[in-house]
Amino acid sequence: TIRDYLHDYKGEEIFVREIRDKEGKVQDAKKRASDFGKTKEEVSKNVLENCIDVRLFGGTIPLNKDSVTFTGPVQFNLGRSLHKVDLKRIKGTGAFASGEGKANKTFREEYILSYSLVGFYGIINENAAKITNLTQGDINLLIEGMWNGTKNLISRSKVGQLPRLLIKVNYKEENYHIGGLLKKISLNKNVDDEAIRSPKNYTVN
């Protein structure tokens, strides 16, 4: 989400992205690393200078006989719904045959949610940020990408998702964060959890 937004809408260089050659083959990680130099020192320096996703999220860059690993200053927790959800299982047929020369199509099965208000939180570690040379400009683009990137999701499972609230906390004390922020959020609902379909059905407390 964030990587796609920063690359497609802000023109930022992204290390972890799909690149195809003239024959349509996907570039592997070692070939991608070679775009930034020949030696370990060259690759490390040039990747950090040019690739905002590595400065933000870190990454492991494989080389021919070695690798470079950067721990990402930005870490997110796994999102979870802030209320009970109406989970439905649907079945359908796929677009392809079940095997070569067969007439029957494959079957697919998936789970969908009628609605869910999903909460995430993350941290930016100032010590790791010094190692990846993360800048305030990078952080500003991260925040922009979190908000606008969500609105630009177009995959089948994510289309229609909208951001509802974004709060950034700046700590005065170094090497400190509150943690467990989702436990400090609750919903005041005017319907049962499973009946929630829009922000009209709740307020955030």
Predicted regions mapped to residue ranges:
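RNA-binding basic/glycine-rich loop and surface signature characteristic of RAMP-family CRISPR effectors
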Residues: T1-N205
